[in-house]
Each structure stands twice: as structure tokens, then as C-alpha cells.
């Protein structure tokens, strides 16, 4: 038998959460800071550019099609469908990679509208590389363990998950996100979290085997700013994440700011990148010390916030 103890209420709650959340040829190629990470493939009179600098489990791919008259294209990667659309006059999109993506080559397919004469499809094999991530122990108090499986906590989780799954075709944000606070990162996205007990088949819940965001070491009361322009989808106190702000940036991109002490925006507010939305703190079951947890979801897949802050993904659409 395993030496680790089980907490049935918590495991059931985490399993419930996990179930709800399934990551032109004549033109000159844009310069790239890391040329070896940029894949370019001709397709008719067009060129498909794929930036793989952040192609790791929980990372993203940036795709741009140069040339042609298409205004959109559908994508398929590891069985997940997506799309790219015009951004600042460029056919461009960010495609998420799930945290459990195997480090290997994966086939990315693009499907263009217009029938046989003007449409068609093409595929590119894209390398995904593994990354080393740390582990940290996590000790929850008996009260926190009891609260984790409560109906109140599960109800709060539904609010958060509904916000994460919001679909909005409008693009509020163009270009990379920015850090919501100034401070050192003390624990990265995707790091393993050891709760000292069996977590069950949790793979992509709000708590579980891996950290869902980036933790910044900042004192309570630090101003927290919107990492990108968008609409406030949720601004309320939740059991797991405490005082929480969820921002919808459009086109499937959602950011979550957790454990705040104070929230200064309301649901439905439209904010610009850099707008103050609250102050950091230590609220919620998941906060053991004052800090800010910043999480990002793209088409409901949890991805590395630092990948979406990488300006090299947008070199050609500026």
C-alpha cells in the first residue's frame, strides 16, 4: 500500500474540476532573433511561418501565413481544432500546446477556405521540446482540506471554469502580454506540486500535479495591473484562489490573477493593458504566503504565461 494518505473529499473535488477543463514567396521573410526556431514552408504563392521558440509542453506555437487572400484558416494539432485570423492585416494566430504534450514532432495542419481552386490544406511537422521544471512541497491545513471538497468550493470553481471557457471572437489584445507586477518569479508554470497524498487522475484541474500559473514574490498591497487589454469576466472572492480577477482578451485568451487583497474593477469593465485591477495578497485556500499567481488559458488549455509575454512570437504583425 502507498505510504501516502488519501483525502476522498479533496480527490473527488479535484477530479470534478479536471473533468470540466479538457494548451508570398516573393516577399522577404521577417527577421527572427532565433532563426533556428522559425519554420517557413511554401504553400502555393504563400509562405507558412511557424515560430517554435516556445514550443514545449504547456507552451505555444505562433503561426502566420504570408501571401494569398485568405482572411482565416482552421488548424488541427493533436486532435484539437483551432483557427487563425487577421490581426493588424496579417493572417496570424497563437496555438496552445497542452501541458501533457509529448516532446516529439507533431503534425500541424492548416485548412484554407475557398474550395479546391482557392483553398486546400497543408501540414508541417513541428518539434516540441521538453523542459525541466522544479518540484515544491505543498502542505494544506486540515481546515483547507475540509473546505476543498465543500459544495461552496465546487460552486466557486464552476464560476471560474465558466469564465475560463468564455468564447469571444473580438480581439481586445494585440501583441504580447506584460507581467502584471514587478517582482521575481518564485515558482514557474508547470512545476510539480507535492501535496503529500495521492491526487487521483488529476491532469488539468485548478489544483493538482502541476502548478497552473506563475507565482510572483511581491508583498501584500502591491499594485496588480492587467497583463493585456480585455473585458473583466469575473471579479469576486473564490474558495481556492481568493480574491480573483479574470480578464478575457478575446479570441480564446483568458488570464487569471489570484490571491488578491483588493479588487478595483467590476465584471463587465473594459480595461487597457497596464490598468490597475487590484492589489496582491494572501487570500484563498491556495495561498500560503503573500504573492501573486498569474495564470493564462488559451482556448481553455492552461499554458505558460511567460510564453504569451514573449515578444518574439509577434515579430511580423507589429
Segment roles from a protein language model:
Residues 223-233, 265-280:
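Short, well-structured beta-strand-loop connectors
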Residues 122-242:
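Surface-exposed, glycine-biased beta-strand/turn segments
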Residues 227-264, 289-291, 295:
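Zn2+-dependent peptidoglycan hydrolase active-site motif and core
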Residues 2-11:
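Bacterial N-terminal signal peptides that target proteins for export
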Residues 245-248, 269-318:
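Conserved, short, structured surface segments that act as functional micro-motifs
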Residues 11-20:
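Bacterial N-terminal signal peptides
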Residues 66, 219, 237, 275-276, ...:
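Short, surface-exposed secondary-structure boundary micro-motifs
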Amino acid at each position: 500500500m502507498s505510504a501516502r494518505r488519501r483525502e476522498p473529499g479533496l480527490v473527488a473535488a479535484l477530479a470534478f474540476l479536471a473533468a470540466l477543463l479538457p494548451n508570398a514567396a516573393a516577399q522577404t521573410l521577417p527577421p527572427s532573433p532565433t532563426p533556428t526556431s522559425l519554420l517557413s514552408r511554401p504553400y502555393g504563392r504563400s509562405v507558412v511561418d511557424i515560430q517554435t521558440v516556445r514550443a514545449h509542453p504547456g507552451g505555444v506555437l505562433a503561426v502566420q501565413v504570408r501571401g494569398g487572400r485568405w482572411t482565416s484558416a482552421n488548424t488541427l494539432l493533436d486532435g484539437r481544432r483551432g483557427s487563425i485570423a487577421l490581426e493588424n492585416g496579417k493572417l496570424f494566430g497563437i496555438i496552445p500546446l497542452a501541458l501533457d504534450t509529448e516532446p516529439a514532432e507533431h503534425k500541424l495542419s492548416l485548412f484554407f477556405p475557398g474550395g479546391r481552386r482557392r483553398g486546400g490544406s497543408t501540414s508541417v511537422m513541428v518539434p516540441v521540446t521538453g523542459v525541466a521544471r522544479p518540484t515544491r512541497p505543498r502542505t494544506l491545513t486540515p481546515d483547507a482540506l475540509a473546505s476543498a471538497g465543500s459544495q461552496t468550493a465546487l460552486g466557486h470553481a464552476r464560476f471560474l471554469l465558466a469564465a475560463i471557457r468564455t468564447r469571444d471572437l473580438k480581439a481586445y489584445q494585440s501583441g504580447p502580454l506584460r507581467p502584471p507586477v514587478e517582482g521575481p518569479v518564485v515558482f514557474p508554470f508547470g512545476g510539480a506540486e507535492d501535496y503529500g497524498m495521492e491526487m487521483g487522475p488529476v491532469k488539468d484541474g485548478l489544483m493538482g500535479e502541476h502548478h497552473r500559473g506563475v507565482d510572483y514574490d511581491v508583498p501584500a498591497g502591491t499594485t496588480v495591473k492587467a497583463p493585456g487589454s480585455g473585458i473583466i469576466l469575473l471579479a469576486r472572492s473564490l474558495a481556492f484562489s481568493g480574491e480573483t480577477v479574470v480578464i478575457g482578451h478575446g479570441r480564446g485568451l483568458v488570464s487569471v490573477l489570484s490571491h488578491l487583497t483588493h479588487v478595483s474593477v467590476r465584471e463587465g469593465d473594459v480595461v487597457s493593458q497596464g490598468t490597475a485591477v487590484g492589489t496582491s495578497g494572501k487570500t484563498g485556500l491556495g495561498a500560503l504566503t503573500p504573492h501573486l499567481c498569474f495564470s493564462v488559458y488559451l482556448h481553455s488549455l492552461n499554458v505558460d504565461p511567460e510564453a504569451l509575454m514573449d515578444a518574439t512570437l509577434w515579430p511580423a504583425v507589429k
